[in-house]
Amino acid sequence: MSDFWHKLGCCVVEKPQPKKKRKRIDRSMIGEPMNFVHLTHIGSGDMGASDGLPRAGGVQEQMRSKCGRDRQWSNSGVL
């Protein structure tokens, strides 16, 4: 009898669960920004450097002067 259950188990295959469809987001679901503080504009000349890496020093200095804080900006986000 155990041979019967073994053979039956080999024939029954679990169907994969259908992927849940992600809810689409449209413009009506997006609200206004909260706690937004505009610090500065960054132009193409501010970020490009000859070696392909961004020059963050000047931009960081602009941001520091705009926000009125002596915050040390991290270079970890620089690519």
Swiss-Prot record:
Residues 63-72 have a biased composition (Basic and acidic residues). It comes from Xenopus tropicalis (Western clawed frog). PANTHER family: CDC42 SMALL EFFECTOR PROTEIN 1 (PTHR13502:SF3), CDC42 SMALL EFFECTOR PROTEIN HOMOLOG (PTHR13502). The gene is cdc42se1. Residues 41-79 are annotated as: Disordered. This is CDC42 small effector protein 1. GO terms for cellular component: cytoplasm; cytoskeleton; plasma membrane. It comes from the Eukaryota. InterPro entries: CRIB_dom (IPR000095), CRIB_dom_sf (IPR036936), SPEC (IPR039056). The keyword Repeat does not apply.
